[in-house]
């Protein structure tokens, strides 16, 4: 009998930039609990602000959604290979701070796909 070999990290090749690979954490029970703890308060604040009528509330909600995107990326993107930013090997943090937005969005989509959010849940997170 052969033992099951489960890889907790998934390699995702970039479609936007040849040679760039994202290493994305696969979902597990423990990681899901950790993520829910991190996201819970931000999600509440976003829901409250989106219910408001003012432009300021909408802008604040958009800012919190961007913060949530950054949180998802830092939680699920473990490494980036094949990309240098300002002469140094890219990291998840440097991709979020100074990398091309197209690659940030692509890495974020890979993380969200691994989280398993459906389209309605993705809209709210």
Language-model region placement:
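Short, surface-exposed, charged amphipathic helix/loop patches that serve as local interaction elements
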Residues: 20-125
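Short acidic, Pro/Gly- and aromatic-enriched capping/linker segments at domain boundaries
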Residues: 1-15
